């Protein structure tokens, strides 16, 4: 590995270091750093939030002078420990090495391992016209022709993603299934259903169950739910990170992990005859921020809006005006971040993708109107204003000829648009088959027994955390579902009290559409179906993001679903008692009393 000097302070600057937090900028690189002094001990880090790369400033609420606050999402870092304190118990900041040289200068050093893509380097060869072609299908799905091989990224081409919350914005080319069947290999970046689409893969498996599919070796396996999905795929290959995988003499690829969500997110470098294609997909900080520069083509997400925050929140600061301003500000920050990233990496060509979804179900009209997305053309114009990078806003069926574009970006045949009259945007979606699957869970025998609540949350395995959550089943419009469950879970001791405990505790209310929450519970699915799919409405007091709780239910649930067959057998043996929770509100603020009725 190599050692890089990031910042050098003169003896005078060292002598003037104050106790506590010191901010510095390297004027030659424009990079920012934080140095914390506690008597003779010094700790240092980059001034960059690990969440989404925001800049830290002094936290005026911290009278002890140990923490800094991110200007993006108000995350807080205790620089004395290098641990994030908001959200609590989440990430640790990467530290820099602090050294004094022989001239009493202070150096901030970073130890860098060699870039894996630089191993066995290959010089770019000239590409023939038509030799490398990239065709956009929809959302994050690209069809790559690489010599005599074909590779497809993240095929989501039919059905919804995240239960019923996301639907395709673009109409895929009519030959999409043929294209998938002709692929030599498929790369699926991560387990989210806008990338790992079981409805799409079911169609493909009916024709080519043995098609080679490649995924990264993430902590949460990409295909963790394959057996339960009923999709018959027989050639899934789990690859180590940072190692070239040779496809033929001209083609190889390398999968890399995300620096913020290494347990699930990946990105990929594809290289053909020395020309690199970088696809960072949804990674928040792909490969920890270390990426190849001057690749032939780079593609990444751009749109924003892939979260229930803040649209699904209410109470306190979450007024419609606050939400609108927050969303507007966040989208602008994301645009600027992506533009900076592209400027720094200097690809020859950049393509924004993986953001073309819409909340098209009529019941999600509010989300659709509120959750505005970034315009890819606005991002591309921003990039072109600050760099010489060529940009491509893709339309379904459009094909980029890499050889032509690298040789002459003005070549009219460099990008072939779909024929005149081709349908670009979807105007209808086949809702019913997918909603029927969700609705089937509502009347399942499991939910005749109120003891499913204890069974489910015991299976989930999250406890020893001071948080009380009220779960409320609702109809389409988030009104209480007639006869639905409304109950408390105290995660400190994993109990299910009739009313909130007397001790001090954070509190959340989660209103969930009954069809989705019961489908998730029955099948042991991750809560991204609820949260990212906009199937909940939330309130919290205090207004704190509980990272450990959400991270557990979004990524760390058991790999096998609850054993409901055994549960029902136990219910039969214990008698026919069928219990239902009902709620009576008291005059006491934020305190709910629960009664239990035996309905047998």
UniProtKB/Swiss-Prot annotation:
Q: Where is the Rieske domain?
A: 9-107
Query: Which reactions is this enzyme annotated as catalysing?
Result: CMP-N-acetyl-beta-neuraminate + 2 Fe(II)-[cytochrome b5] + O2 + 2 H(+) = CMP-N-glycoloyl-beta-neuraminate + 2 Fe(III)-[cytochrome b5] + H2O
Q: Which UniProt keywords apply?
A: 2Fe-2S, Cytoplasm, Electron transport, Iron, Iron-sulfur, Metal-binding, Oxidoreductase, Transport
Q: In which pathway does it act?
A: Amino-sugar metabolism; N-acetylneuraminate metabolism
Q: Which Gene3D superfamilies match?
A: Ribonuclease Z/Hydroxyacylglutathione hydrolase-like, Rieske [2Fe-2S] iron-sulphur domain
Gene Ontology process terms (BP):
CMP-N-acetylneuraminate metabolic process; N-acetylneuraminate metabolic process
UniProt GO molecular function: 2 iron, 2 sulfur cluster binding; CMP-N-acetylneuraminate monooxygenase activity; metal ion binding
Q: Name one Pfam family in it.
A: Lactamase_B_3
Broad EC category:
oxidoreductase
Q: Which cofactors, if any, are listed as required?
A: [2Fe-2S] cluster
Tell me which InterPro entries the record gives.
CMP-Neu5Ac_hydroxylase_Rieske (IPR037339), Cnh (IPR027033), RibonucZ/Hydroxyglut_hydro (IPR036866), Rieske_2Fe-2S (IPR017941), Rieske_2Fe-2S_sf (IPR036922)
Subcellular location per UniProt equals: Cytoplasm
Tagged with keyword Endoplasmic reticulum: no
> Could you give the cofactor binding note from the entry?
Binds 1 [2Fe-2S] cluster per subunit.
Q: What is its main location?
A: cytoplasm
Q: Name the Enzyme Commission number(s) assigned to this protein.
A: 1.14.18.2
Query: What GO terms fall under cellular component here?
Result: cytoplasm
The yes or no answer to whether the keyword Transport is present is yes
Similarity comment text for this entry = Belongs to the CMP-Neu5Ac hydroxylase family.
Q: What does this protein do?
A: Sialic acids are components of carbohydrate chains of glycoconjugates and are involved in cell-cell recognition and cell-pathogen interactions. Catalyzes the conversion of CMP-N-acetylneuraminic acid (CMP-Neu5Ac) into its hydroxylated derivative CMP-N-glycolylneuraminic acid (CMP-Neu5Gc), a sialic acid abundantly expressed at the surface of many cells.
What's the protein here called? Cytidine monophosphate-N-acetylneuraminic acid hydroxylase
Which species does this protein come from? Gorilla gorilla gorilla (Western lowland gorilla)
Gene name of the record: CMAH
């Amino acid at each position: 590995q190599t050692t890089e000097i990031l910042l050098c302070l003169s003896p005078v600057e060292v002598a003037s270091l104050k106790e506590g937090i010191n901010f510095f900028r390297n004027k030659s690189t424009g990079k920012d750093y934080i140095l914390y002094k506690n008597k003779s001990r010094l700790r240092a880090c980059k001034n960059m939030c690990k969440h989404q790369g925001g800049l830290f400033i002094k936290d005026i609420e911290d009278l002890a002078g140990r923490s800094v606050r991110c200007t993006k999402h108000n995350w807080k870092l205790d620089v004395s420990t290098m641990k994030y304190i908001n959200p609590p118990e989440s990430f640790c900041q990467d530290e820099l090495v602090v050294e004094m040289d022989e001239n009493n200068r202070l150096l901030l050093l970073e130890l860098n391992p060699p870039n894996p893509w630089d191993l066995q380097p290959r010089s770019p060869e000239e590409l023939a016209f038509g030799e490398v072609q990239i065709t956009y299908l929809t959302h994050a799905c690209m069809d790559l022709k690489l010599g005599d091989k074909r590779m497809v990224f993240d095929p989501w081409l039919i059905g919804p993603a995240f239960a019923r919350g996301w639907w395709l914005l673009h109409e895929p080319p009519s030959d999409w299934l043929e294209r998938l069947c002709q692929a030599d290999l498929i790369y699926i970046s991560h387990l989210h259903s806008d990338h790992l689409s079981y409805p799409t893969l079911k169609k493909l498996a009916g024709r080519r169950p043995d098609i080679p599919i490649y995924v990264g070796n993430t902590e949460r396996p990409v295909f963790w739910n394959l057996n339960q999905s009923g999709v018959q795929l027989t050639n899934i290959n789990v690859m180590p990170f940072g190692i070239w995988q040779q496809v033929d003499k001209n083609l190889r690829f390398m999968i890399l992990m995300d620096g913020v969500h290494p347990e699930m997110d990946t990105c990929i470098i594809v290289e053909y005859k020395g020309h690199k294609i970088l696809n960072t997909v949804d990674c928040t900080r792909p490969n920890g921020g270390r990426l190849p520069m001057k690749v032939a083509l780079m593609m990444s997400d751009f749109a924003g809006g892939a979260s229930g925050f803040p649209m699904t929140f209410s109470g306190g600061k979450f007024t419609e005006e606050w939400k609108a301003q927050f969303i507007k500000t966040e989208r602008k920050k994301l645009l600027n971040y992506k533009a900076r990233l592209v400027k720094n990496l200097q690809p020859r060509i950049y393509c924004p993708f993986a953001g073309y979804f819409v909340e098209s179900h009529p019941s999600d009209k509010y989300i659709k109107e509120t959750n505005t997305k970034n315009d890819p053309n606005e991002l591309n114009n921003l990039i072109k204003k600050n760099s010489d990078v060529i940009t491509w806003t893709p339309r379904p069926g459009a094909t980029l000829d890499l050889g032509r574009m690298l040789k002459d970006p003005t070549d009219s045949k460099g990008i072939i648009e779909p024929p005149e009259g081709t349908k670009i945007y979807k105007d209808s979606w086949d809702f019913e088959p997918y909603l029927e699957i969700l609705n089937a869970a509502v009347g399942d025998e499991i939910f005749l027994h109120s003891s499913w609540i204890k069974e489910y949350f015991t299976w989930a395995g999250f406890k020893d955390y001071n948080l009380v959550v009220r779960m409320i089943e609702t109809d389409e419009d988030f009104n209480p579902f007639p006869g639905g469950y409304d109950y408390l879970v105290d995660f400190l001791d994993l109990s299910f009290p009739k009313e909130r405990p007397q001790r001090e505790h954070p509190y959340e209310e989660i209103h969930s559409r009954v069809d989705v929450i019961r489908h998730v519970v029955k099948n042991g699915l991750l809560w991204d179906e609820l949260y990212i799919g906009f199937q909940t409405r939330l309130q919290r007091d205090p207004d704190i993001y509980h990272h450990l709780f959400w991270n557990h239910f979004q990524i760390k649930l058991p790999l096998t679903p609850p054993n409901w067959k055994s549960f029902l057998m136990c219910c039969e043996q214990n008698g026919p008692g069928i219990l239902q929770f009902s709620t009576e509100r008291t005059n006491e603020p934020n305190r709910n009393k629960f009664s239990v009725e035996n309905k047998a």
